[in-house]
Structure formats: structure tokens, C-alpha cells
């Protein structure tokens, strides 16, 4: 199968063609993956009588779900660029060791997170801002979802190693299997069997299990470089790889964890300044953001293995061209989407809820939140380049800068100190986009480009 299957050749062909060849299947995969969350929210919002309340309650669970995904990406997102760099250097034994180390860490952390989450789900949800009425829906959803932690982490954390070998279509299929299953199972468990919010969680973990099974089937049998769990005598040898994986993956890990931190802070402030209705508004905004960011993530992830491979192969011209193509694609797309958000916000909001009261508050909030969204591109591009080229310190620093040092303080400063109420919560995002995104991108230009020039000498 792997010999006959079409692969993206990261070393040859046009850079634009390679990026599109990797990014388009990833875009389909990202869109399908988005369906896991989007479809869930659409169905939850339409549960008779309790839809809006249940939507807000499940929104409170998102930070914990993001934390689980963050750990999967810590090992997968940290290991895959190192895997690609080793392949570019023609060091395939090292590449396999990196992949096996990542897989072992994904599995061990998955079990630990599941047990911890099940034991402390209720106090965690209360910490995240769940009221007594919200716990009625949030707690059963989270308890069921946590049972699928391990397959969820395998599906997310090991998929990058499929893409890093050039099998982007296979990577897409691994996501498609779960997404299609979720589309079928959601209405069955929610409405036909009458499980309500519990049905959403059951459908999700069953779908994620199917995706994980496909990923393991391919990586253990069909891929060129195969994965397995580390043996006892390999653990000491893998320690160095583990440190490099974690240090490089820490940037994406911090970004996702700080996204959860921001969501927690926003929910806490909104519950005081606006009530439960504004937590539902933030859930809608988060859903819209996931929707419009999906192609951006696909382009970034499609470009990343090409950057890593050619950097390892010492081909600076292809690295530089990849950065330029990445920038053009993302900026054009974001410009179109930003205009759509500002001009027709109602269309995007109606995808998730038709509640008129919610619509009234969500429209101005959405415009405020996305006011400077195009500057976020600068952050994404800089972060992708830093991570792909194994620039750990820069990747980690800029992950912390925008969220921890800018957004979180502003989330409290603007509503309480500047007396801006709920508006302050939503406006904290564009302010951070302008400051954090600009600094990140300028730093990338001033550090990476000179290094590539020296590599040519």
C-alpha cells in the first residue's frame, strides 16, 4: 500500500505545489475534525427547551478538552518536526526512535489524564466557572468524554507522523472516518435514543476510537517508517529524544493551554459582568473562530514538514520560498474571512444558534473580538517557522507573550479597571493580536532570514 500510495515529495517539485499537496488534504481533515465540535454544538443548541443552557454548560468543558488535545500535540507536534528534520538528514533510525518516543509518551500521558480527570472532574468544572445549573449538563458530558482520552490523544498526537512521511491523504482519511461516524452517531444518541448531552459525549468517544484504530493500523503496518511502543532497554536511550520533543512541543502546548486559561478567565469575568447568556455568546465566538481558523491551521501544518525536511537537508532557498508562499496564502484567506465576519456576522452565528436573544448580544461581541484578526496571522506564521526549524526558545516565548502577558491581564483590566464590562473581555483579543502578532513576525524575519542566508554561504 505505502509503495503505491501517492506521497508528497518534500525535497523535489515546486514549493507551492508541495504545500498545496500537503495542505489541501489537511484542510479537508481540519474541516472534518472541526465537525466533531461544531456538529456537537449545533445539535446541543437544538435540544428542546434546554438547548441554550446546555450549550453554555458544555462550553465550560472546552478548556479541559483543549488541555487533553494540548498534551497530544505536545508529543505529536514536538516530535513530528524533529522526525522530519532527521528524515531530511537521511537519519531514518533516529527518525523512528523519535516517533516511538512520542507514541509512548502519548499513551502514558493519556492514561494519567483520564484517571486524573475522572477523579477531579467536578472541582475542575467549578474552577472553570460552572454554576450549579450548568453542572447538570457539564458534569455528565465531561465524565463520559474523559473515558475516550487515550484514543483521542492517539488520533491527534500520531497523525502528524503520517503527514510527516508525505501521506497527507491517509492523514485526512484518519480524521474523515471519525468525523463521518460522529455525524451519524450524534443524532442517533441525542434524539433517537434520548441521551441528550450524554449522547454527544458517547458519539464523540466512539468516533475518536475509530480514528485512533485507523492511525495505528497505518503506522504499525502500512507506513514506510513504522511505530511501536518503546521497549524497556530503549527507555534510557530515548530520554534525550523525549527532552527535545517536549521542549519543541512546549510552544504549541503553551498556546493551547493558554487558550484554555483565556477561556476560563473570560468565562469567569463574563459570568460576573454579563451572566450565563454571555458565556453562551463566548461559546459561539469560539466556534466561529474554530471555523475560520481551520484553513489557516491546514496551511501551517501543510507547510511545516516541508520547512523541517528542507531545513534538515540544508536547502535554504526552499525554506525561504516556503515561508513566502505560507504568508501569501494565509493573508489572502484571512482578508476575505475578516471582511465576511465584519459585514455578515449574523450568517456565521446562525450556524450555531437561532436564539434571537443570543443573536442580539453575539453580533457586536463577534465584531469586537475579530476587529484585528488579520494580525493573528503574523503570530501563526512566526510560530510555525520557529517550531518547524527547531527554534525552541522563540517558539515558547511567543506562545507565552500574547496570551499570558497580554490577553489575560487585559481580560480583567478592561472590564474592571477601565469599566468596559463585557466589551472589555471581547476587545482584549484584538489588542493582543496587534501587539503579540507584530512582535512575533518581526522577530522571525530578523532571526531566521539571516540564518538562511548564512546557510547558503
Model region roles, listed by residue range:
Residues 21, 44-66, 133-137, 197-198, ...:
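Interfacial/gating helices of multi-pass transporter permease domains
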Residues 1-23, 83-148, 194-249, 307-372, ...:
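Short alpha-helical transmembrane segments in multi-pass integral membrane proteins
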Residues 27, 31, 35, 39, ...:
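Generic alpha-helical transmembrane segments of integral inner-membrane proteins
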Residues 73-76, 145-163, 171-182, 200-215, ...:
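Short runs within selected transmembrane alpha-helices of multi-pass transporters and secretion channels
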Residues 21-40, 144, 178, 207-211, ...:
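Transmembrane helical elements of multi-pass membrane transporters/channels
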Residues 31, 35-56, 125-132, 188-195, ...:
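Helix-terminus/linker motif at the lipid-water interface of multi-pass membrane proteins
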Residues 10-50, 63-78, 82, 107-114, ...:
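N-terminal transmembrane alpha-helices
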Residues 55-115, 152-171, 267, 281-339, ...:
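Small-residue-rich hydrophobic transmembrane alpha-helices
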